[in-house]
From Swiss-Prot:
One Pfam family it belongs to: Terpene_syn_C_2
Family: Belongs to the terpene synthase family.
InterPro entries linked to this entry: Isoprenoid_synthase_dom_sf
Protein name in UniProt: Sesquiterpene synthase-like protein Agr11
Top-level lineage group: Eukaryota
MF annotations from Gene Ontology: metal ion binding
Keyword annotations of the record: Magnesium, Metal-binding
Designated gene of the protein: Agr11
Length: 355
């Protein structure tokens, strides 16, 4: 069976870019995260981390951030480990771990309590390293740090709910699913890390057009390792008469509207040249230049997600480049083809669909 995938970013203005320090950052971050992986997973479980796909995503997403790119890789590796680990624990344990991580980041300068969970220790270490990315003379570092921790808490709380839903076999409506996945995908954290070197004031981050662009980005980041949290599964569950191809066609139509909305908001973004005050001053360019870099980072992040899905073997095996070029996805049959089998095969081969 063949499915034609929608070319969601056909008119996207941002081309593929890879951080030139990718190889070194990947090696450094892999060595950094390995002790945690070894503590949490057995030999079989550790195989999921051998290829370090997350460092490629970080290097595609933060292609312009040349300063210590390994810290971006660290973030993605840490939360990938967290996500994989909470997939196999109870909702109660997931909730407890979320509290441990947030507390570790809020109190990163304090000694860890005796018997601290290794995820808490690693979160504390990550946060100490990540904050070195903030400009030494920045005026908005506290705003940036507070925003990142709040987004971390939002993400971890959502992952806890996801664990509960998985435990109870819950399948959401499309609207509920999109709202949930904007949090569980960690999209806000990805964007918050773009801000770290830009020293953007609160007035910019709370501007309605900037927030609209951030919201649109989060709609493109829909991925999961569980069939109940796959958008195509949700669409077909809500529309029992819809074929698999019809579900992808629905996705293509929805995504086209999202892309157009992003482009419209970029065109309507006002100038920040006249904004003044201590919080707007920086040694790294005018406020308008820094805002432009941030918006470019949003666009690049969307492109990175799409490129990454096809360039790793995680979703399409060795067929990624061919699938990207032809847009044809082959769903391999099982002995007895059922709707459930098709969705499970689809989840393995195309779990990086765009919402």
């Amino acid at each position: 069976m063949q499915i034609i995938l929608p070319d969601i970013l056909q008119t996207w203005a941002y081309a593929r870019l890879l951080n030139p320090h990718y190889d070194g950052a990947k090696l450094e971050s892999s060595l950094w995260i390995h002790p945690l992986v070894a503590k949490l997973f057995d030999q079989k479980g550790q195989k999921a981390f051998q290829n370090d796909y997350t460092s490629l995503l970080a290097s595609l997403m933060y292609s312009h951030q040349g300063k210590v790119p390994s810290r971006r890789c660290d973030m993605m590796n840490l939360f990938f480990v967290y996500d994989e680990y909470t997939d196999v624990v109870s909702p109660e344990i997931a909730h407890r771990l979320s509290k441990i991580v947030v507390d570790a980041m809020k109190n990163s300068d304090e000694m860890s309590p005796c018997g601290e969970h290794p995820i808490g220790d690693k979160a504390k270490e990550f946060w100490r390293l990540a904050t070195t990315l903030l400009p030494a003379t920045g005026s908005n570092s506290d705003v940036c740090k507070s925003r990142f921790i709040n987004l971390t808490e939002e993400y971890l709380n959502a992952v806890t709910v996801e664990a509960r839903d998985r435990n109870e076999g819950t399948i959401h409506s499309v609207k509920e699913y999109l709202t949930m996945r904007r949090a569980t995908s960690g999209a806000g954290l990805m964007l918050a890390l773009i801000e770290f070197e830009l020293d953007l004031p609160k007035a910019v981050l709370e501007h309605k057009f900037v927030q609209a662009l951030e919201e649109i980005y989060t709609r493109t980041r829909v991925s999961s390792g569980q069939a109940n949290h796959n958008l195509i599964t949700v669409v077909m569950h809500e529309n029992p008469g819809l074929s698999l191809q019809g579900a992808f066609d629905w996705l293509g139509s929805y995504a086209a509207g999202v892309v157009e909305c992003f482009q419209t908001n970029v065109r309507n973004l006002p100038s920040f040249c006249d904004v003044e005050g201590p919080a707007c001053e920086s040694v790294d360019g005018t406020l308008q230049e820094r805002v432009d870099k941030y918006i470019s980072g949003l666009g690049q992040a969307v492109r990175a997600e799409d490129d990454w899905a096809f360039e790793t073997t995680r979703y399409y095996g060795e067929d990624g480049p061919k699938v990207r070029e032809t847009r044809v996805l082959v769903i391999r049959p099982v002995k007895r083809i059922t709707r459930r089998h098709l969705l499970q095969s689809l989840e393995i081969k195309y779990s990086m669909v765009r919402g």
